[in-house]
Structure formats: C-alpha cells, structure tokens
UniProtKB/Swiss-Prot annotation:
Assembly and interaction partners: Homotetramer.
Record's keyword annotation contains Oxidoreductase: yes
Binding annotation for NAD(+): 29-57, 99, 138
GO function terms (MF aspect): L-lactate dehydrogenase activity
GO CC terms: cytoplasm
Pfam families the UniProt entry points to: Ldh_1_C (PF02866), Ldh_1_N (PF00056)
Record localization: Cytoplasm
EC number, UniProt record: 1.1.1.27
Protein name in UniProt: L-lactate dehydrogenase A chain
Catalytic site positions: 193 (proton acceptor)
Amino acid sequence: MSLKEKLIVNVHKEEQPHAHNKITVVGVGAVGMACAISILMKDLADELALVDVIEDKLKGEMLDLQHGSLFLRTPKIVSGKDYAVTAHSKLVIITAGARQQEGESRLNLVQRNVNIFKFIIPNVVKYSPDCKLLVVSNPVDILTYVAWKISGFPKHRVIGSGCNLDSARFRHLMAEKLGIHPLSCHGWIVGEHGDSSVPVWSGVNVAGVSLKGLHPDMGTDGDKENWKQVHKQVVDSAYEVIKLKGYTSWAIGLSVADLAETIMKNLRRVHPVSTMVKGMHGINDDVFLSVPCVLGYSGITDVVKMTLKSEEEDKLRKSADTLWGIQKELQF
C-alpha cells in the first residue's frame, strides 16, 4: 500500500473532464508572459496553456509559473510546442510574431507576421474551434484582420487588443495632470492602435463634467494648457519605454488581462478594441479599427455608436484607407 493510499481514500473515480475556463497564450516573450501572470493573478482560468516554438524557454516559463502554484488559484498550467495542449480553450491570446527590425518597413513586418499567423491560426482553430481569438501582436489592427481571414471565424469572435491600452495611457496621463485616479477620468482613444490613433476630446469628462465644455480649446493647437501633448505622449509612450528598457510588457499584459476578465466573466463592459468597422463612420473596406465595443462571453456583442466630430471621422477614414492599402497587398 503506497503512502498516498494510506493517506487518501478514493470515493469517486473521476473521468478527466475538460477545463471550463481554459485560456491559451501563444508566444512566451515579454508580452506573452506579462499577459500570463496578469491572468493568473486575476484567477480568470482553471487551466492556462502556453505555446511557443522555442522549447527550452517555453518549458522554463511553465516551470517558473508552476513553482508559484501555492500562491495562485489556477490548478493546471501546461505548455507545449504542439497545439494539442491548447485544446478546448475558451480564449486564445496571440502575442507571437516577429519584432520590427531597425529600418524595417511596417509592410515588411506585416508580411513576416502573416507568415507566422498562417501557421498559428489553423492550429488554434483545429483544437479550439469555438474559442474567442484575442490578437495582441503588432501591427494589431492588420493582424486582427489576418486572424479573421485565416480562421474563418465570425467577426464577433476575433478581437484586437487595439486601443484598450492607448485609452488607459490617456486616462493615466490625464489623471496625473488633474491629480485624481484614472478610474475617475473618462476618455476614449479610437481608431488605429499607435501613431494615427484618434483622441475623442468631446467625450473627455470627470464625474460627467465635460472638460471641453469648461475649456473649449482642449485638444486644439491654440490651447494654452497644451492638452494635445497628452495624446502625443500616449503615441510616444511605447517608443519611450522601448528606448529605455528594450520592449513594453507590463501595461499591455494588464490591459489584456482586463479584456480577458470582461470576456471570461461575461461582464459586458465597454472597451475600445479592434473590430470590423466596415459600414461604420463611412468606412467601406474590410478593416479592423478600435471603437467602443461591448465584450462578453461570446466576444463582441455590440458596438457603441460614437458621436464624432467631422475631423475625427476624417482621421478614422484616413487610417482605414492606409490599413486597406497594406492589407490588399498581403499574400495569404
């Protein structure tokens, strides 16, 4: 009789059930692991699967997380190069992809990542045909489109992390200027994640008080207080962090866990995430851009119709045209 048999009497033979709330993270670089730890610390999954092509790094990251099991409430952490470990995932988060090389054009980076996605997406779909896909790899709006095209999923199940982080950075910087918590500063950044994102100044408020109502010059070039600089800082923030520490990780990891929480718990919170915007704001192509979306267990269920100024809509359409210009050149 083994020690285990002396200690424990089995009263019910359990057939191995599937996890109910399984999450997979594809790519165990700095961003993937920041997503993983943030998800673990929010207790969002009963099983976490990690996938990557670099097997030693992958196993090391899995072991390192497993060694923290006592301090976590996720009973199963698995990893593998083979996508079989991802089977029955409810949410699959894609952070894998090539990093931009110095002097490399965005279009070139896109094509390299399309080739990586051509391998990843069919494997994800094979083992988790009903999952939601959350794309984080950059350029996120184009790669969300790519994931949608390759997966054959309905558009509500393919979500780009989009401007969720841009909006969080915006609220943080605004809050610092005003001396209050970011949760109490409301403001939205929409459109393309990154350089051509669009701050919706008309909607910025604290306690329902419109800041543009109090300070009509807000966000314009003639503004004495230079609030436009806040949006510029949002755009520059990733470049600044990359220059200082080599990459960004913690904020995007927390932002992704925030989205994962809304999806896994069916919270129906509204987030600025990348979705198919054809037919909205005068956009006529199959492009993905961030707009305020209601998120829940089935993915994106609704989109909030924003009231945008004509110049804001122009910026959105310009982004859409740029993205479509790149997308139509892609080889699938």
